[in-house]
Amino acid sequence: METPLKAPESSLKSCNEPFSRTSEQDVATQELARQGEEILSQLYRPLETCNNSCYCKRCCYHCQMCFLNKGLGICYERKGRRRRTPKKTKTHPSPTPDKSISTRTGDSQPTKKQKKTVEATVETDTGPGR
């Protein structure tokens, strides 16, 4: 009698197998849903600083922060404003007040005296020519 009782149990197991497969599929989809939620939570989590100073390919791609900073060169850190050097106050007057303004500022236009000397050197140069 034991043998006929085992046969119906095995037939019941075969009927229950598709149900167990669907429950396994439900577990798998729930696991995927949890993984998706975890990925989204990581995406919206603020980036953590990384103290790795290496710029090799492996280190550039090991976290999102390194990829932005090292791989793409994007840095969102707040840069401090540069301080201007304080202007030095002049305690003494300019040493050459008799020079013209153009010579003090380094103006490239020559004065009349310089023009005359240039013309004189051109006229006196009587080298071999045409």
From Swiss-Prot:
Q: Which InterPro entries match?
A: IV_Tat (IPR001831), Tat_dom_sf (IPR036963)
User: Can you list the GO cellular component terms from the UniProt entry?
Assistant: host cell nucleolus
The PTM entry states: The phosphorylation by CDK9 does not seem to be important for transactivation function.
Question: Where is the region Disordered?
Answer: 1-29, 79-130
Q: What is known of its domains?
A: The Arg-rich RNA-binding region binds the TAR RNA. This region also mediates the nuclear localization.
Q: Where is the composition biased (Polar residues)?
A: 11-28, 99-111
Q: What does this protein do?
A: Transcriptional activator that increases RNA Pol II processivity, thereby increasing the level of full-length viral transcripts. Recognizes a hairpin structure at the 5'-LTR of the nascent viral mRNAs referred to as the transactivation responsive RNA element (TAR) and recruits the cyclin T1-CDK9 complex (P-TEFb complex) that will in turn hyperphosphorylate the RNA polymerase II to allow efficient elongation. The CDK9 component of P-TEFb and other Tat-activated kinases hyperphosphorylate the C-terminus of RNA Pol II that becomes stabilized and much more processive.
Tell me which family the UniProt entry assigns to this protein: Belongs to the lentiviruses Tat family.
Q: Report the subcellular localization.
A: Host nucleus, Host nucleolus
Question: Residue numbers of motif Nuclear localization signal, and RNA-binding (TAR)?
Answer: 78-90
Phosphothreonine: residues carrying this PTM: T85, T89
Which keywords does the record carry? Activator, AIDS, Host nucleus, Host-virus interaction, Phosphoprotein, RNA-binding, Transcription, Transcription regulation
List the source organism: Human immunodeficiency virus type 2 subtype A (isolate ROD) (HIV-2)
Upper taxonomic lineage: Viruses, Riboviria, Pararnavirae, Artverviricota, Revtraviricetes
What segment(s) does the record annotate as region Cysteine-rich?
A: 50-66
Comp. bias intervals (Basic residues): 79-91
Protein name per UniProt: Protein Tat
- GO molecular function terms listed in the Swiss-Prot or TrEMBL record: RNA binding; RNA-binding transcription regulator activity
Phosphoserine modification sites? S94
Q: Give the matching Pfam families.
A: Tat (PF00539)
- One GO biological process term: positive regulation of viral transcription
Quaternary data: Interacts with host CCNT1. Associates with the P-TEFb complex composed at least of Tat, P-TEFb (CDK9 and CCNT1), TAR RNA, RNA Pol II. Interacts with CCNT2; the resulting complex is unable to bind to TAR RNA.
Question: Which residues does the annotated region (Core) include?
Answer: 67-77
What's the domain of life for this entry?
Viruses
